[in-house]
Regions:
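A ubiquitous short alpha-helical element
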Residues: 7-9, 34-40, 105-107
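Glycine-rich flavin
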Residues: 44, 49-126
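Intrinsic disorder at enzyme termini
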Residues: 1-34
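Helix-turn-helix-type domain boundary/helix-start signal
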Residues: 28-29, 36, 61, 88
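Mature N-terminal segment immediately following signal peptide/propeptide cleavage
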Residues: 29-50
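Context-gated lysine
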Residues: 9-11, 26, 39, 53, ...
């Protein structure tokens, strides 16, 4: 059924002009300043560093292990680990935002980020 069908009147159709398809629940409005900064840093890394290497790797059917060193230098690995142990001491919302930005470019690298941060680094810290 569509909005042009007889079951819907024009006045009853939702206004999708104001709908934000990238943030339908407007969750970005709930983020704290430090979470926004971490998200923006991760997005910048994903666009400027990760994307070109993913495109190049896809063409050559290769994985670029150097990306992990670069993620580490950016502080994207183990961000929930306290600063005194080498992490950023960020919350899990920030961790999710970083994962979302990396996932936006490539799910394989996001999986590797998650394994390194959650299954390797966190158990060593804990």
């Amino acid at each position: 059924m569509n909005f042009e069908s007889a079951s819907y009147k024009t006045k009853d159709a939702p206004d999708l002009n104001d709908f934000d398809w990238l943030d339908p629940f407007k969750l970005s409005d709930l983020l704290e300043e430090h979470e926004v900064l971490i998200k923006e840093s991760a997005a910048s890394f994903a666009n400027d560093v990760l994307m070109p290497k993913v495109v190049e790797g896809f063409a050559g059917e290769e994985v670029c292990p150097e990306i992990f060193s670069e993620m580490g230098k950016m502080g994207l690995l183990g961000i929930t680990i306290p600063e005194q142990y080498g992490g950023l001491g960020a919350n899990y919302v920030s961790y999710g935002l970083v994962a979302q930005e990396i996932e936006r470019i490539d799910s394989g690298y996001r999986s590797m980020l998650s394994v390194q941060s959650s299954l390797v680094m966190y158990p060593i810290y804990a």
